Regions:
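Sec-dependent N-terminal signal peptides
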Residues: 2-16
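Short S/T/G/P-rich N-terminal loop/turn motif that feeds into the first structured element of a domain
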Residues: 17-102, 111-261
Length: 261
């Protein structure tokens, strides 16, 4: 039950949940089919937890592309959404392997034996597993729902100054909100990392998330953007401060392929 040990966030992908566990998986070569079979078993467990009000939702994303040039890049990401840290911890503290098997067995209604379920979930399909607990610190409005097939852009950030979140909230967010209002972006969110498993990258302090609109583009340097802060000169200085406040460790484009809420 390694997945139970440490778990992440986002909307109705983050929006109704303030806490989430996000898990990035590198899948062993040739075992993608077995991994997806495993998630189809796990989703039955998540459906039950959602029905009982113990979590807000669960989503599975396929990593389409990343900026990672060295080492393994993740193949999939799962997002588990909760009302609070306490709710997340309470759900997992009351769970064990036998309870998990019983829940799944009941939900599949005889389609899978306990032996088959165990074989699927115990298969060694994951080469690595980076898990982060994240908390929402800022976002655009209104709240949104992602549809299966849509894409999301994820950026892993390393905070460089103490008031990094203030730069995102007071400079980046107003521009992103205007972009949402103009119909050129669906949603943006900023989350901070509050916990992680041993395999997770220790440098990462935050993630930013953007849900694009097909055929639309983000224009950071438009006249509309600079006018928010009094003109091109002032905006350029502020933009430099934002850039210096964090380092982008890596970026990825992900596609939503399964979702329960």
């Amino acid at each position: 039950m390694k997945k139970i040990i440490v778990l992440l966030l986002l909307s109705p992908i983050f929006i109704t949940a303030q806490v989430a566990s996000v898990d990035f998986f590198v899948i062993n070569d040739g075992m993608e089919e077995e991994y997806l079979e495993m998630e189809k078993v796990w989703v039955e467990f998540h459906k039950q937890m959602i029905a009982e009000g113990k979590m807000y939702g669960w989503s599975l994303f396929k990593v389409v592309s990343t900026s990672i040039e060295e080492g393994d890049s993740p193949d999939y990401m799962t997002l588990n959404r909760f009302e609070s840290i306490e709710a997340m911890e309470a759900m997992w503290s009351d769970m064990n392997y036998e309870k998990f098997l019983k829940i799944v067995k009941k939900r599949v209604k005889g389609k899978l034996s306990t032996r088959k379920i165990k074989k699927i979930v115990e298969a060694k399909v994951k080469k690595s597993h980076h898990s982060y607990v994240i908390e929402m610190t800022d976002q655009t409005v209104p709240s949104v729902e992602m549809e299966v097939g849509e894409f999301i852009q994820v950026d892993a950030m390393i905070q460089q100054v103490d008031d990094y979140e203030g730069y995102e909230t007071n400079i980046a967010q107003p521009i992103l909100q205007r972009t949402v209002n103009d119909g050129n972006l669906k949603w943006w969110g900023l989350t901070k990392v509050s916990n992680r498993n041993d395999q997770a990258l220790k440098e990462i302090t935050h993630f930013t998330w953007q849900i694009p609109i097909e055929g639309k583009e983000m224009d950071w340097w438009s006249e509309k953007s600079s006018s928010i802060f009094g003109g091109e000169f002032a905006y350029g200085k502020l933009a430099n401060l934002v850039g210096e406040s964090r380092k982008v460790l890596g970026s990825g484009k992900l596609q939503l392929i399964m979702s329960e809420k």
